[in-house]
């Protein structure tokens, strides 16, 4: 089906929403050490961030310092890459390890700076660009902004929490790039067992064209794996589901099949972890969550769980009992046969990838060529974003916004080329259901 971008995306912004997005980029560029004149978009409550002075300024940024707001000096400085995406972090000055930048704090964003004080701008910048799959940079940021109801300060703090988590705790890039074979090679038996059971499978698409994650809680027993292995398995599934997202679809549907569920399967720890992930680190990624065929023992459990949920997430949850209920949202051809649908897929048929499809993982020359192209697109995107922020008329702003969208498409297409060089082929790649 033909899809159009939903409200609050870069393709559909109102004038006020566009201003908030500009403010987000100004604050990010400030932390990355990129010069931009944000005076036209920052309000009285949000004074323009002052750039850090001296050597500290030089330590920040994905593509080096920007020497002025416009002109040749800026373009020249953009040509000097300071930290490469997916590569080891690099900085311009040899004394980088001795001195970390201390950006001037902006009123209302003190918590953000506190959260990121142990990280430098290059690390945060690198993580931002590497967490993109086929999504657009602006739309990734807008997830956090929408989740915080367009409150710039709350959105920036949420983003800071999530970036720090990705760098220091969750490390989802390591998990998804290593894939199922990564868990097997690391001898993480609990993760391997969950994969072999087919506890959660990305399969099919709903009526909006968004991927479905089919979960069978009856297969879960807490003793089969550690809590850490359950969390890592959950992150693997979430990140693999992200690979199925293609603009303008930016959410996934989760179908919890509770047939056969008993108290022996109940485990509150992973439920809490998933709630935290979706609310704090993957905002606006959940489209709909179906709890299907809940047994009579489930209401007391639900009474506990619903108190942990943010109202926005809770509003996306629906209880269903029949295939007809599901067919309001999911085509019959995409509903598992065992639930009364027409999809005859074998959900017990997981096969561990043997690595034979990972032919490009060792091709450093090919990877370098695609990364060089990616760096160039990102540099052009940053320049276009600065011109968009600094534009002095609605017409000029619209022109640069359109340019940003075009470059976002290029970046998305580039990731499709880059993916086999950095990510081990998953079960979904091998069986042909995933086409990044």
From Swiss-Prot:
Subcellular location: Cytoplasm; Endosome
Basic and acidic residues bias (residue ranges): 86-102
Predominant location category: cytoplasm
UniProt GO cellular component terms: cytosol; endosome; lipid droplet
Matching SUPFAM superfamilies: CRAL/TRIO domain, CRAL/TRIO N-terminal domain
Top-level division of the source organism's lineage: Eukaryota
Pfam family, one: CRAL_TRIO_N
Keywords: Cytoplasm, Endosome, Lipid degradation, Lipid metabolism, Lipid transport, Phospholipid degradation, Phospholipid metabolism, Transport
Domain CRAL-TRIO: 188-347
A single GO BP: phospholipid transport
Region (Disordered): 85-104
GO molecular function terms noted in the UniProt entry: phosphatidylinositol transfer activity
Family label: Belongs to the PITP family.
Its biological purpose: Non-classical phosphatidylinositol (PtdIns) transfer protein (PITP), which exhibits PtdIns-binding/transfer activity in the absence of detectable PtdCho-binding/transfer activity. May also regulate post-Golgi membrane-trafficking events and have a role resistance to oxidative stress.
Oligomer status and interactors: Binds phosphatidylinositol (PtdIns).
Protein name: Phosphatidylinositol transfer protein CSR1
Organism field: Eremothecium gossypii (strain ATCC 10895 / CBS 109.51 / FGSC 9923 / NRRL Y-1056)
């Amino acid at each position: 089906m033909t899809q159009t971008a939903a409200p609050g995306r870069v393709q559909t912004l109102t004038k006020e929403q566009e201003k908030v997005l500009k403010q987000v980029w100004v604050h990010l560029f400030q932390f990355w050490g990129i010069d931009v004149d944000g005076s036209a978009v920052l309000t009285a409550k949000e004074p323009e961030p002052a750039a850090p002075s001296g050597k500290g300024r030089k330590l920040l940024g994905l593509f080096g310092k920007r020497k002025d707001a416009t002109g040749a000096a800026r373009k020249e400085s953009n040509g000097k890459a300071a930290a490469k995406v997916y590569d080891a972090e690099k900085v311009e000055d040899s004394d980088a390890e001795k001195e970390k930048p201390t950006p001037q704090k902006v009123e209302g964003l003190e918590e953000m700076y506190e959260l990121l004080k142990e990280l430098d701008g290059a690390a945060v910048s690198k993580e931002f660009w590497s967490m993109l799959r086929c999504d657009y940079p602006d739309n990734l940021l807008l997830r956090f902004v929408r989740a915080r109801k367009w409150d710039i300060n709350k959105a920036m703090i949420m983003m800071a929490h999530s970036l720090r988590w990705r760098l220091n705790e969750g490390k989802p890039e390591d998990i998804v790039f290593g894939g199922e074979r990564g868990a097997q090679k690391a001898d993480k038996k609990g993760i391997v067992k969950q994969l072999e059971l087919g506890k959660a499978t990305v399969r099919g698409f709903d009526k909006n064209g968004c991927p479905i994650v089919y979960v069978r809680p009856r297969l879960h027993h807490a003793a089969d794996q550690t809590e850490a292995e359950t969390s890592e398995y959950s992150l693997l599934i979430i990140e693999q589901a992200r690979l199925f997202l293609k603009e303008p679809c930016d959410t996934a549907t989760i179908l919890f099949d509770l047939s056969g569920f008993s108290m022996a399967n109940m485990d509150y720890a992973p439920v809490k972890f998933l709630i935290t992930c979706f609310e704090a680190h993957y905002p606006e990624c959940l489209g709909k969550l179906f709890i299907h065929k809940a047994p009579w023992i489930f209401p007391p459990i639900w009474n506990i769980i619903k108190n942990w949920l943010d109202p926005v997430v809770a509003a996306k949850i629906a209880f269903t009992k029949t295939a007809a209920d599901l067919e309001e949202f999911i085509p019959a051809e995409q509903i598992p046969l065992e639930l009364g649908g027409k999809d005859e897929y074998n959900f017990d048929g997981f096969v561990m990838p043997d690595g034979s499809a990972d032919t490009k993982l060792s091709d450093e020359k090919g990877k370098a060529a695609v990364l060089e192209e990616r760096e160039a697109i990102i540099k052009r995107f940053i320049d276009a974003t600065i011109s968009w922020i600094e534009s002095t008329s609605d017409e000029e702003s619209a022109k640069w916004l359109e340019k940003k969208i075009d470059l976002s498409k290029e970046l998305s297409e580039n990731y499709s080329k880059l993916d086999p060089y950095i990510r081990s082929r998953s079960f979904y790649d091998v069986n042909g259901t995933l086409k990044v």
